[in-house]
């Protein structure tokens, strides 16, 4: 089935943009921050509120879709074996950055059909960067077509990610990062895997490495 003619991707993009503005305009205090399982693993009341908003608004656009979100909220079915449409949501990717107003966090929404990704939307409201991609139609940054870089490691920036709550392979990770440091022009760690991957898609980085990412 051709989903491109069935799904209103522009409407989804607008919802993701509105969710990003909720994050940008947030007034965070310590009583709105909670710990999840693992070291330095946080969730804020804004993670929950933004996910609720996304589920409610995206349901209006694609009522038949299921939802797999990072946070436990109503409407989040978290079904892994789906043959139909399913939204995958990270309401705030880069929560620690968000907590400290580091301004490198994003709203990340993917859409899958029959267990295959067909579209993705990543929005950083702090610099108004909207990354979009639809299967078969290419990837874009604010409407401009983007491509992965042609250059190799020695001619570009290498990026990586790590988290203290997923620290079982950090020794291996930092050995590889040391090699990337020696062989590249520079190494960066942004703190948002979705944004760092988009940087590779846009040609700003040549590689992104992280040992463990939760879906």
Please state what every model-predicted region is.
Residues 1-92:
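N-terminal subdomain of lithium-sensitive/metallo-dependent phosphomonoesterases centered on the IMPase/IPPase/PAP
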Residues 23, 47, 58, 95, ...:
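Residue-level signal for inorganic ion chemistry
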Residues 48, 71, 91-94, 125, ...:
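Generic detector of well-ordered alpha-helical packing
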Residues 80-140:
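DPxDG-like acidic metal-binding loop motif
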Residues 118, 146-148:
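Short, isolated positions in well-ordered beta-strands
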Residues 149-215:
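An extended, acidic
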